Structure formats: structure tokens, C-alpha cells
Amino acid sequence: MAFLQIDYKSEALMRGVNIKVILPSDGMAGKWEPPYKTLYLLPGYSATATELITYLGLRGQSELKGIAIVLPDGENLFYQDLPDRMTFYSTYVGKELVEVTRKMLPLSTKREDTFIGGISMGGYGALYNGFKYRDTFSKVVAFSPASDAYMLLAEEDAPGFSRKQFEGIFGSKEAYYGSECDMCTQWTRKDVDNRPELFLCCGKDDRLVYDAVEKLENALQKE
């Protein structure tokens, strides 16, 4: 297993960025050969790539499964393009990051070997960008995703969220539902080919997002 930190100038974000990469380059059995299957893993709200590596057994899983893991930092922006701020976070994680890491590292360029996943806000980012860039990603993994952004505001004790903040990212609540940002709308569309495979999970005690995840699950089952 190899661990890398890469700093480069992002065109989409118009600033320098740091990414963490785990490669299964030296498997004990010598069975993992490049180009590697790749998971782009998105941190949640207020989290960083370092936190995910610290709290999760990503290095071991990379070695066991023979998969590269690429982790950008989150920015509390739900991985959206925000032209008014000249910040294109969706373009960054869904397009630029894939292209840059494929040029730098021995990663597979095949769709069937390229996945996106995330936790909480990162889970929303994975759902949104996995669907948007479905020609790039064949699988989406969403762990306790904030799959309905505006439902977060229904939780009185939810820290760090405000309607003004969400309106700055998604527009009004009325504009959000039925738009491409609404995961129930996007993932149940009938006019879409090449839909990624989806793994969706959430603990029942995760009261911040459980109702939203259940809502998405019900919508998918009705499809």
C-alpha cells in the first residue's frame, strides 16, 4: 500500500488544492497490478480527507480489495458548481479530479473500474455527481447521505445549517424540489441511459438524515 499527498492548482476551483491518495501498489501477495480500479471518496460537512483516513480503515481496504482511493477535501458546498462564486466544485470532483489523477497515477480509465462515494454531505455529492457524470462512474456508494438538503433544516438541533446558506447553494426550497439537485427526481428519471449502480445505506439512529434517505429509498423502490 502506498499513501500519497498531491498539491496542484485546480482550474475548476481557481486555487491550489490538496488531495490524498491510497494505492494498493505493494500487495503482500503481489496480486494487484495497475491500472487500478478507483474510488473517489467525498468527505462530509465540515470534514476533511484526513479525517476519513484517520477514522476509517481505508488503507487496509485498499490493500484487501486492490482499489485505489482518492480523497479531496470537502468545502461545505455540497459539491455543486457555484458560478456566482467562481467555484465549480461539481466540475472539480466529477471531471477535473478524475482527469488529473488518471494522468498522474496508474489508474484505470474504464467506466466499469471507476466509482464515486461519500459520507453525509459527501454522500449527497456522490449521488449528485455520480448521476451527472454517469459516463464516468459506473457505481455510486452513499453512506448516510444528506440526500434531501432542505430536510436538514427540519431538524431543530442540526448544527451549522441555515436557510440562507442553502439558498445560496441550491436556490429556494421551491426551486430545489423537482430540479437536478433533488435526488428523488434525478434518480427516478425514465429518460436516462447508463444509470450507475447504487449502494445506499443509513443507520436508523442517524436522525439527521434517516428520513431523507428513507424517502429516497421509497422513491427508488416505486420506480
Predicted regions and their residues:
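Non-catalytic cap/lid and distal C-terminal segments of serine-dependent acyl enzymes
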Residues: 1-223
